[in-house]
Amino acid sequence: EMSYVRTIKSFDRNITINVDFNYLLTASLLSLPVASEIPTTVGVTYSLALLPDSKMRQRVTDSRVGIASVSKLTFDNNIAKSKQTLIAQRWNLIPQNLKAYEQGKLSKPVKPICFYIDDAFPVEWKNAIKQGVELWNKAFEQAGYQKAIEALDFPKNDHNFDADDIAYSCIRYVPSTAEKVTSSFLANPQTGEIINASVFVPANVGDQIYRWLFLGSAASDATMRTSHLPQDKFNQGLKYMVACEVGRSLGLLDNIG
């Protein structure tokens, strides 16, 4: 009876329910009690969404290409036999000028991939975040798309905009002690179409950027031999970390080794 629904939001294609679960936490370490009935609150968000009305053409995953996939299991008339197919997870980009695209020329997509940048970010962070997102346009040009991805501020005069609506992919500011930039995306399990993505940048991201740059470059870069991270180095690191997570949000797997 201590848990309750905090908010319910309804949109055109999804609903979001925020719930606060309250517990009395008891914990032990090495059989020794370390906490007894400590009041604890855990916030959980549930989202239910309709799948797109139009179905994107599936593409079977090629193991030679680092693309995320969703598993699809099918059964034939022999109920004891099943087949697993891995469907590539990707954004549904459609060229505006199909004729030019087929001739190998660049074309803008009908609907570009758009990430909205949280208003809660410090102003001096935003340009690095925008650069980290739009850096991927160079890669999309190799696939024939011009200005395929963009980063915009939260709309100020659009009363229909809500960051909890899956119609909008957002880069969110997280006021926590965490240091690592993370991401997630939502894909249609039937087709693999990515329909929403989120990138989360914590307030203490600068601590991780400092450690990475100090360990990797302090021996040759005198500006890193200090306890204070220079703003230009912070921007460089933030751009890299955002670009990395946006890449994952595009359905790309880590290129490790």
List the model feature ranges, each with a label.
Residues A143-F154, L253-I256:
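Surface-exposed patches in mature extracellular/periplasmic domains of secreted proteins
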Residues K233:
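Conserved nucleotide-sugar donor-binding subdomain of glycosyltransferases
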Residues A120-A148:
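Zn2+-dependent metallopeptidase catalytic core
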Residues A128, I256-G257:
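Short, surface-exposed helix-loop/turn micro-motifs enriched in polar/charged residues
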Residues E134-N137, G192, Q236, Y240-N255:
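Active-site recognition of the HExxH zinc-binding catalytic motif
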Residues E1-F121, A139, K156-I209, L213-P230, ...:
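Auxiliary tRNA-acceptor-end handling modules of aminoacyl-tRNA synthetases
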